[in-house]
Amino acid sequence: MMAPSSARPLRRFGHQLFWVGAAITVCAWALTAQAQQQKPPQAQQEPQQQTRRPFRIGVLNAAWAASHPTVEGLKAGLKELGLEDGRDVTFDIRFTEGKLSAIPPAAEALVKARVDLIFTSQEAATQAAKDATESVPIVFTLVGDPVGAGIVASIARPGGNVTGISSLQTELAAKRLEVLTTLAPAVRRVWLIYYQLDLGTQPMIVKAFEAGQRMKLEVSPKGLADATELKRVLGEVRRGDAILAPEGSSPELTIAIIERSLALKVPAAFGTALWIGYGGLVSYGPDYYAQGMQAATLVAKILRGAKPQDLPVEGAERIDLAVNLKTADLFGLSVPRKILLRADAFRR
């Protein structure tokens, strides 16, 4: 689910960043330099006379601002890999301010603009980019289940022109339920509200339902065809229930869930710490900025000649647990010590 870009008012602990070294690039540079020393002066001057244009990266998402955390993470990661904004790469950013219907035309516009690569966030943007082109490489982030959504053929062999970073929505479903019920042990019914157009949500629902049975919880999936159904579905939520809000493509859906959660004092768990800053109780899932940095490695490889179909889809490397202590206090919940010790971020 794409969200408004904003500075996150979170206190972070135990950050783990996974960096990919540049040893191969350094070796290649050294061999090139040695070869140039053996050429006559005129041959050495030719590369200086031919300036290659920067790679053009198209960005497609449903964010409310150009400076979304995944995009900022991508820029930082590319810089670490020797591809600097303005010198080696430029960005054509198309964000649709939460309007999913505007995403397909934006994808087609990027293809017509002849970008070298399209960087997407969330399933709707990734699917639109895939529908718009079979030749321009696509690198995605924040897609919960790329195989289940039909975006790639498999994790190891994506096929086609698409690869990227999975946010592991299916794999993390049971853990989110566990965290939610640890914070609110009296809960017996959990509403799983999702956007029906996010096809990758279905495998996650199965995992959540299986986990609910083990925990003796009633898991009630509620799919929305569009935002107009949201009020009706949220109207069924009662005090004593809880909400599991999976990652999706509609930020309006998440904001509405937070508002309903606060109004009824109903605990809700989210897929990223970003929503804790808006009043959500707890989140367990990938960090947006870190996913952008991780995706930078795939982007750099493709810009330097690799094919997307040869680059396996990666799982998000950094998973954060975040708790809004103010919301917990509002709900009358005592945050267990084991949650406090494991949490990577807090909102006070």
What are these regions (language model features)?
Residues 1-348:
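Short hydrophobic alpha-helices and adjacent helix-cap/hinge residues
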